[in-house]
UniProtKB/Swiss-Prot annotation:
It is found in: Cytoplasm. This is Chromosomal replication initiator protein DnaA. It comes from Halorhodospira halophila (strain DSM 244 / SL1) (Ectothiorhodospira halophila (strain DSM 244 / SL1)). The gene is dnaA. SMART domains: AAA, Bac_DnaA_C. Oligomerizes as a right-handed, spiral filament on DNA at oriC. PANTHER family: CHROMOSOMAL REPLICATION INITIATOR PROTEIN DNAA. GO terms for cellular component: cytoplasm; plasma membrane.
Length: 449
């Protein structure tokens, strides 16, 4: 394998492709140079098809730029490079010919711990979670298939656990006898410790390795727990070799979890790794409206938009705000409108305003773009300054309750029309500029959490 060639391609792709797309589609690829072909090995059909449709042409162009005299071509395959030192190749035969399930009698049905309210029908889809939902539905239709394991990562309250339960509920609906278990990684550790204390580790192993689907939440909790990681490693391998589904969630990309063994991180990449981002405005509104309908609450559109614009971090925060508005309306007998919502959420909104100030936004944006706050306030008009300045103005409008004139004044005494132009300019550019869209999402996430 020619590491330098693929590394050179990756370095360029890192400058062109948003981080989330790199983690999902490019970094799972393994490369092997064979003759005049750079073979890229994808972990599954889903990744292969996406790379072929969206990135293979660009990768081919990069090969021509890096080694113009060799006339290299790109070939895509599913699997691992045929290199002796690749551990995945050593297990290839095992994965191709699944181990036989134990001949022992099946244990009695397990308590799945599934929440029946978490289904695909009750999950509100948006751009931020579209891929995660699609992958989860594929797993529900074909558990143990190509997307095994399925690894969902993202911040708190974004729907990872909901999707995991939705898969489990769908599997149980199709196969009521299926042994599906959902649990938090903390419980896995606690049960393992208890089994060790009572000399019942073999029973513990049989329990987990006889499942049809294991859904385990917040695997970052395993960090630093070597004995727990060892047991989960063997459980994970046993389930995958038997073509039983594993789904995991984490609050960050698996390779970013410190204290997690490299062999676990490597195996997590065998299937499909998908990020869930904070919901965009339209999705936040849809979440509020959907929740209101399920609860029998008449929520006016203008109230839904008001709440969605002010609260941006996650779904739980939105649902908590709706519960507070609903409870206040029931207790007071008043109709729900924007003024009532402001009153019901006044302490929450005050906290939000206190946490996110124009000064804080300016410092965050300046640090992100590696410029000085003074540059944002100056009269300089170079693109390296105006773009961050416009971004900061948009975020000030989005994240604070300040008026346009107040925002303009905070940016070196500019008028409201300048702020309005900046907002329209950034919103327009985001539609076509993936890198700018990623900047916006990163800054919004940083300031909203």
């Amino acid at each position: 394998m020619d590491d330098s060639l693929w590394s050179a391609c990756l370095q360029q792709l890192e400058r062109e492709i948003p981080e989330q797309q790199l983690n999902t589609w490019i970094r799972p690829l393994q490369a092997h140079l064979e003759g005049d072909a750079l073979r890229l090995y994808a972990p599954n059909r889903f990744v292969l098809d996406w790379v072929r449709d969206n990135f293979s042409a660009r990768i081919g162009e990069l090969l021509a730029e890096i080694r113009p005299d060799e006339h290299l071509r790109v070939e895509l395959e599913i699997g691992s490079p045929p290199t002796p030192d690749q551990r995945e190749a050593a297990t290839g035969a095992t994965r191709a010919a699944p181990a036989q399930r134990s001949s022992e009698p099946r244990q009695r049905p397990v308590d799945s711990n599934l929440n029946p309210g978490f289904t695909f029908d009750s999950f509100v889809e948006g751009k931020s979670n579209q891929l995660a939902r699609a992958a989860s539905m594929q797993v529900a239709d074909n558990p143990g298939g190509a997307y095994n394991p399925l690894f969902l990562y993202g911040g708190v309250g974004l729907g990872k656990t909901h999707l995991m339960h939705a898969v489990g509920n769908a599997i149980r609906t199709a196969r009521p006898e299926a042994r599906v278990l959902y649990l938090h990684s903390e419980r896995f550790v606690a049960e393992m410790v208890k089994a060790l204390q009572h000399n019942a580790i073999n029973e513990f192993k049989r329990h987990y390795r006889n499942l049809d689907a294991l859904l385990i939440d917040d695997i970052q909790f395993f960090a630093g727990k070597e004995r727990s990681q060892e047991e989960f490693f063997h459980t994970f391998n046993a389930l995958l070799e038997s073509e039983q589904q594993v789904i995991m969630t984490c609050d960050r990309y698996p390779k970013e979890v410190n204290g997690l063994e490299e062999r676990l991180k490597s195996r997590f990449g065998w299937g499909l790794t998908v990020a869930i981002e904070p919901p965009e405005l339209e999705t936040r509104v849809a979440i509020l409206k959907s929740k209101a309908i399920r609860d029998g609450v008449d929520l006016p559109d203008e109230v839904a938009f008001f709440v969605a614009k002010r609260l941006r971090s996650n779904v739980r925060e939105l649902e908590g705000a709706l519960r507070r508005i609903t409870a206040n309306a029931q207790f007071t007998g008043r109709a729900i409108d924007v003024d009532f919502a402001k009153e019901a959420l006044r302490d929450l909104l005050a906290l939000q305003d206190k946490l996110v100030t124009i000064d804080n936004i300016q410092k965050t944006v300046a640090a992100y773009y590696k410029i000085r706050v003074g540059d944002l306030l100056s009269k300089r008009r170079s693109r390296s300054i105006t773009r961050p300045r416009h971004m900061a103005m948009v975020l000030a409008k989005e994240l604070t309750s300040h008026s346009l004139p107040e925002i303009g004044d905070a940016f070196g005494g500019r008028d409201h029309s300048t702020v309005l132009h900046a907002c329209r300019n950034i919103k327009s550019l985001i539609e076509d500029d993936a890198r700018l869209a990623e900047d916006y999402d990163n800054l919004l996430r940083t300031l909203s959490t």
